[in-house]
């Protein structure tokens, strides 16, 4: 089976292609000009070289099969692998953006886009609140399949080449359980699509022994930890992984995470009614994160089919956030985007092609 050209970093292509400058030319065609056929690259390449590319590599290995649009402008995409027909989802989040013009100090309003990518089909972690785990684990995604999610979404929305995306590994799967492919995808996002590592966030459920491995790659990405509880008993009931990597084990590795000045580790905290949304829980969370440069992102539980949990009130979420902020721990409440199309946090899963999304 031919290798996907999107599976190769710039360095790998430079070593493979002769002369090596062909790699940079090819990267421009792939990631700046969105070409999906080697024949469309004839301006730079000879017929013999194009024949070589067609013989050795393939381009697109996934396709969009369904798109659902939310009232807030966000979109959920169902992708199908062209190799094994398995499906997976990704989400485009559309948000308002404000910037200050450095020359006039005027406030400029615009839009920013975040692509929530999947790194696995299904998930092995088995969090009880997450819809993804309902379908079980199928396989890891290749770097090329991760990259193509962003490429196809950008292409589908006619976003200009210069429009920067934010990438969050918060879709289906646990990124640290597919670390090699995730790291390769991050490198290609950076060198190919020109997405700064500062715009890329890797979210983990707490695979503690792989956090230092990710740190050692020196990729410069942002780290997010799915915490969701302030004691091991509650966290283990929500996230079985906690029985192997308990809260203190995870926090010990987070304390070693290299942070740039003014940067913080994000802790995601899913608020579930009458389980972990009390003021007492907020006080315990403050104590847990003492000494860690952190910020807390509160997520109100998003209901899904078969779930036993309930969404808390916005009032209780504000009380939780207000307490943390009053004590100097930066805390925000995440706006639930794409809730009406079941594309919010914890709502993605593999679907059969016959199913509507």
Swiss-Prot record:
Provide the disulphide bond pattern.
Answer: 116-345
SUPFAM superfamilies linked? Radical SAM enzymes
Q: How is the cofactor bound?
A: Binds 1 [4Fe-4S] cluster. The cluster is coordinated with 3 cysteines and an exchangeable S-adenosyl-L-methionine.
Q: Where does [4Fe-4S] cluster bind?
A: 123, 127, 130
Question: Which cofactors are required for activity?
Answer: [4Fe-4S] cluster
Per the record, the domain of life is Bacteria
Q: List the GO molecular function terms.
A: 4 iron, 4 sulfur cluster binding; metal ion binding; rRNA (adenine(2503)-C2-)-methyltransferase activity; rRNA binding; tRNA (adenine(37)-C2)-methyltransferase activity; tRNA binding
Give the enzyme's EC designation.
Answer: 2.1.1.192
CDD domains, per database record: Radical_SAM
Q: GO CC annotations?
A: cytoplasm
The question of whether Iron-sulfur is a record keyword is answered with yes
The residues covered by the Radical SAM core domain are 109-340
List the catalytic activities from the record: adenosine(2503) in 23S rRNA + 2 reduced [2Fe-2S]-[ferredoxin] + 2 S-adenosyl-L-methionine = 2-methyladenosine(2503) in 23S rRNA + 5'-deoxyadenosine + L-methionine + 2 oxidized [2Fe-2S]-[ferredoxin] + S-adenosyl-L-homocysteine; adenosine(37) in tRNA + 2 reduced [2Fe-2S]-[ferredoxin] + 2 S-adenosyl-L-methionine = 2-methyladenosine(37) in tRNA + 5'-deoxyadenosine + L-methionine + 2 oxidized [2Fe-2S]-[ferredoxin] + S-adenosyl-L-homocysteine
Please name the catalytic residues of this protein. 89 (proton acceptor), 345 (s-methylcysteine intermediate)
Q: PROSITE patterns given for it?
A: RADICAL_SAM (PS51918)
Q: What GO terms describe the biological role, i.e. biological process, of this protein?
A: rRNA base methylation; tRNA methylation
Q: Which UniProt keywords apply?
A: 4Fe-4S, Cytoplasm, Disulfide bond, Iron, Iron-sulfur, Metal-binding, Methyltransferase, rRNA processing, S-adenosyl-L-methionine, Transferase, tRNA processing
Cell location: Cytoplasm
Instruction: State whether keyword DNA damage applies.
Output: no
Q: What more does the record tell us?
A: Reaction proceeds by a ping-pong mechanism involving intermediate methylation of a conserved cysteine residue.
Which PANTHER family does its entry note?
23S RRNA METHYLTRANSFERASE, RADICAL SAM CORE DOMAIN-CONTAINING PROTEIN
Alphabetized NCBIfam families for the sequence:
rRNA_mod_RlmN (TIGR00048)
Q: Which family does it belong to?
A: Belongs to the radical SAM superfamily. RlmN family.
Q: Kindly provide the name given to this protein in its UniProt entry.
A: Dual-specificity RNA methyltransferase RlmN
> What organism does the UniProt record list as the source?
Helicobacter pylori (strain HPAG1)
Gene name, please? rlmN
């Amino acid at each position: 089976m031919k290798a996907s050209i999107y599976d190769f970093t710039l360095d790998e292509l430079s070593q493979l292609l002769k002369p090596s400058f062909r790699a940079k030319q090819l990267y421009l065609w792939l990631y700046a000009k969105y070409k999906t056929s080697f024949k469309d690259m004839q301006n730079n390449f000879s017929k013999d070289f194009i024949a070589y590319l067609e013989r050795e590599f393939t381009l697109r290995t996934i396709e969009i099969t369904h798109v659902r649009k939310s009232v807030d402008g966000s979109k959920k995409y169902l992708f199908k692998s062209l190799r094994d027909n398995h499906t997976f989802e990704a989400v485009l989040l559309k948000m308002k953006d404000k910037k200050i013009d450095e020359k006039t100090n005027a406030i400029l309003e615009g839009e920013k886009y975040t692509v929530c990518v999947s790194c696995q089909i299904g998930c092995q972690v088995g969090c009880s609140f997450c819809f993804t785990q309902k379908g079980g684990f199928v396989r890891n995604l290749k770097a090329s399949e991760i990259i193509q999610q962003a490429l196809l979404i950008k292409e589908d929305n006619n976003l200009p080449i210069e429009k920067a995306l934010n990438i969050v590994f918060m879709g289906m799967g646990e990124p640290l359980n597919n670390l090699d492919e995730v790291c390769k995808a991050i490198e290609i996002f950076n060198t190919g699509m020109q997405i700064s590592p500062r715009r890329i966030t890797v979210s983990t459920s707490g695979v503690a022994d792989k956090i230092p491995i990710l740190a050692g790659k020196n990729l410069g990405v942002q780290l997010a930890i799915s915490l969701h509880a302030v004691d091991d008993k509650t966290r283990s009931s929500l996230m079985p992984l906690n029985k192997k990597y308990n809260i203190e084990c995870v926090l010990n590795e987070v304390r070693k995470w290299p942070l740039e000045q003014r940067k913080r580790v994000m802790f995601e905290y899913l608020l579930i009614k009458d389980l972990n949304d009390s003021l007492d829980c907020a006080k315990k969370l403050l104590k847990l994160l003492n000494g860690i440069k952190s910020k807390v992102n509160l997520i109100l539980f998003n209901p899904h089919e078969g779930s036993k949990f309930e969404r808390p009130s916005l009032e209780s979420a504000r009380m939780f956030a207000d307490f943390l902020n009053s004590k100097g721990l930066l805390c925000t409440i995440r706006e639930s985007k794409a809730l009406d199309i079941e594309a919010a946090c914890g709502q993605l899963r593999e679907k059969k092609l016959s199913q509507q999304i």
